[in-house]
Amino acid sequence: PAVLGLGDIGALSGKPVMEGKGLLFKIYAGIDVFDIEVNEKDPEKFIQAVKAIAPTFGGINLEDIKAPECFEIENRLKEELDIPVMHDDQHGTAIISSAGLLNALEVAGKKIENVRIVVNGAGASATSCTKLYVALGARKENILMLDSKGVITSDRPNLTESKKFFATDRRDVHTLEEAIKGADVFLGLSKGNVLTQDMVRSMADHPIVFALANPTPEISYEDAMAARPDVLMATGRSDFPNQINNVIGFPYIFRGALDTQAKAINEEMKIAQKV
């Protein structure tokens, strides 16, 4: 598992997160949820366990599964089951951050097809967010994605398929500091305190900063606002303004899927919900 910002803490330790998620399903969308923690790291065994209990349920929300295993698990279950399956860490985050991005671009007076985007993080949430940005009009050539080794370039060996999709042919940028110069948008789904005030100052006019690492953002709200007054800033935390949180996404997309007896949650549904 990959539980919030806590990493692999085990299935049992992740139970409070799952119980909380179930409560939010009930409060916001009236959906009764059973949280089931699966103590299994082998993707095939996990898939078979989920398939075995699937007849009991109207839909399955996958949670806190690390990349790249999460991609295989979700894709297989979507193909092999006839009920909606969604990995919330990927798509819930993508839907809500996309809605936030479109609003921020409107405030900044910019168009999604023209902006330069820097994505710090290459896990499940980061890649899913960025793919939805592309579906909404962002250009792949305007996107730089970084992992723990720096900017992901096409000449790097042993890239996963999700990283290959966003690998750049550029060879003039390697670090976050280099990548972010002149950028319009920063999306952080990585770790805390990696974005400095100087980096924010080096961005384009009216920069959009989504520092979504939990529990510590890539840069604090106060530091970003102090760096420059024109920044459009959001985090994943409820104690700062402009929170980007899956809770305004996942309950309702499942409510819609269940009410319409949909057999899957597709890209069109995700794009429709962000509006």
Task: Please report, for each region that a protein language model flagged, where it lies by residue.
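Rossmann-like adenosine-cofactor binding region
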Residues: 164-232, 237-241
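Adenosine-phosphate binding glycine-rich loop
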Residues: 88-89, 108, 211-275
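Active-site nucleophile and cofactor-binding loops and adjacent substrate-binding regions
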Residues: 39, 86-95, 118-122, 238-240
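Glycine-rich phosphate/diphosphate-binding loop of Rossmann-like nucleotide-binding domains
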Residues: 3-29, 95-187
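Short beta-alpha connecting loops at secondary-structure transitions
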Residues: 82-84, 115, 161-172, 231-236, ...
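General beta-strand structural signal in soluble alpha/beta enzymes
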Residues: 35-36, 61-64, 85-88, 119, ...
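N-terminal ligand-binding/catalytic initiation module
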Residues: 1-83
